[in-house]
Amino acid sequence: MRLLLDTHVLLWALDDPARLGRKTRSLIERSEALVSVASLWEISIKAGLGKLKIEPRHVFDAIEPSGFDLLPVQATHALEVFSLGAVHGDPFDRLLVAQAMSERITLLTFDQALLGYGPS
């Protein structure tokens, strides 16, 4: 199974894995876990605004050793955003949903607002 980790799932997996719960941690360990470059962009912006107390470079440096692979943002992902309804206004989340749909990957999130897009 391929999973695209939502940004908060990535941060919890790296900094506070217990917050994910045993079943979610096990699912991540048994799957090909992907991290979108868009998540790094989101973390960098929010850290720069003081909304996150984290060094974006540390997150980037922890991705590969944690067994996660990076998913680049492709033009097809950006275009897929157009097809999404207005369920969620956050541009980072919308891009993650579009990537999951385009790549036929399950988006792993605890964000209830994203569930309005249905299974990805």
Segments predicted by a language model, with ranges:
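Short, well-structured N-terminal submotif of metal-dependent ribonuclease cores
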Residues: M1-V35, L49-D61, E103, Q112-G116
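Active-site neighborhoods of divalent-metal-dependent phosphate/nucleic-acid chemistry enzymes
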Residues: E55-F60, P65-L115
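Active-site regions of enzymes building and remodeling cell-envelope glycoconjugates
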Residues: G118-S120
